[in-house]
Amino acid sequence: MPGVLCEDNRLSTSRMTPPLVFEPLFMERVWGGRRLETLLGKRLEPGVRIGESWELVDREDAQSVVHEGPLRGLTLNELWTRQRAEVFGPGLGYAPRFPLLFKILDAQDRLSVQVHPPAAVAGRLGGEPKTEMWFILDALLDSDLYAGLKRGVTRADFEAALAAGSVAEKIHSFPIKAGDAMFIPSGRIHAIGAGNLIIEVQQNSDTTYRVFDWNRLGLDGQPRALHVAESLASIDFDDAEPVIAQPDGETVVACEFFRAERWTLDQPRISDGKGFAVFSVIEGTVRCGGREFARGAFFLLPANATDREIQPVTPGASVLRTTVPGQ
């Protein structure tokens, strides 16, 4: 089959052309807006409230596809399954899919109060665990986040508030600004407030249990489904009043699943290490592999890339660099 032979020839290339750029997948959401277009320059379907741009994803029902270059048209899963060591580097085991998922979230309205199940609970409920982090690209003056419970709130208090429709009063909330970050481990109840534009780095999972949705209707005009029993089984009721992530030098968040660093570039810098790195442009414009990337752009630098230099095009350009442990 000629198509298969062509694919095999491209995947057998000894040196990948850096960087790899993928087509974003835009998701309509009841809470979405248009800032992916107005602030980041992404082309959206007119009149649609886009809440999520999936920038890098390898799931059965959603695949990132290489946008340009010699590997154009190949999926992230094809690269992962057939050129894992070359593109992604050593030590990544035999997982069937790329382990992370990268999104941009545009919250014109509040997201639901929700939780992602810890691994032990996810297995019992038939879901997937999801630990994630948020990096705030842009926020309105009165924007806030919800994360964890207020101190002293018990499970009984929470269930009573659920019954009374006042659960938001039991959740810790705080103001937020551009440049802040928040770590959301599995089991932490959370919600994103209106006015936030957020980069989300997460485990490759799409399991979310909604516990409260602000009594609103979905895109179909009906109340969105809630998952109260699953949420109660997943919430860590000892998780009280977490704080905004406190950077350790350039490291914004480091956990067992990923490491995210903020680089502010006054001069060119080499991305070293044995494996791949995913770059998200936070401010300004950068250049890599002869291509320029503006705010909101994502690219994957392969493990076997020969040109690993990230250059600032505009003074003080800033990127979020995400890697996995051991690389």
Q: How would you name each of these model-derived features?
A:
Residues R97, L105-R110, P118-A119, E128-P129, ...:
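Ligand-binding loop in jelly-roll beta-barrel domains
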Residues P268-R269, G284-C288:
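Short beta-strand segments in beta-sandwich/barrel cores
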Residues I171-M182, G289-A305:
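Short acidic-glycine-tyrosine-enriched beta hairpin
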Residues R151-A164, D272-S280:
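Short, basic/aromatic beta-hairpin or loop at an interaction surface
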Residues T207-F276:
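C-terminal amphipathic alpha-helical segment
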Residues V4-V153, D213-F237, A260, G326-Q327:
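Transition-metal
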Residues F102-K103, L111, E132-F135, S173-F174, ...:
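His/acidic/aromatic-lined binding-pocket segments of jelly-roll/cupin-type domains
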Residues A161-D206:
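Loop-centered beta-sheet repeat module
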